[in-house]
């Protein structure tokens, strides 16, 4: 299993960057996790949109779905140019029918509703869900394949259920929208200390901090998280990758 970061900014992308987007690969299957602003452009530097096998969306805030429309256009135009593309499944929840309806576009993409109470099979991946604490319906994901596990918290404030959900994961991709002295609870986001606490309680092997703030010194997020978690910590950046 290999994860590559495409976008890691919270809220909106910095110049020449992208908000949430992560490419997960295993056995030749390519799953894009969220598709925020700037993701399509940055992804094309190393991977083409028509090569995707599936897209899964945690929630429907713009910094996680902004590039779905242009992804659909890219695959449509490539089909006109003779590049055969199958209909791309876009997995999402059904709690916002207005946004979910946009996932189906001609025969280019098709919205597929996941049941948060069941396990979703997507290629080689088995995906389970946990509803997070966020202003809109949002789901964390536990993605497993061949005995390896990735946790994607998506957007959430800290909740104890996440520790059990994330237990013994090989990689915890954890949102970190705030510094340790701040309080992210009302905004539905975690701090660096929350991320470190979650990683420690869940006994994960690696922690990746993402959904980053646009201010302050990002290295401090790692320093603060390390006061709670003694394992390897990385700060998400464009094309950061991890194979496990």
Stretches found by the model and what they are:
Residues 1-47, 138-154, 171:
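Conserved beta-strand hairpin/beta-sheet module of binuclear metal-dependent hydrolase folds
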Residues 3, 22, 34, 43, ...:
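Divalent metal-coordination and catalytic microenvironments
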Residues 32-36, 53-59, 63, 93, ...:
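Active-site neighborhood of phospho(di)ester-bond hydrolases with catalytic His/Asp-centered motifs
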Residues 38-87:
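Active-site metal-binding motif and surrounding structural segment of the metallo-beta-lactamase
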Residues 67-75, 102, 217-225:
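Metal-dependent catalytic neighborhoods of phosphoester/phosphodiester hydrolases
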Residues 112-168:
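Catalytic core of the metallo-beta-lactamase
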Residues 158-241:
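Cap/insert and terminal regions of metallo-dependent hydrolase folds
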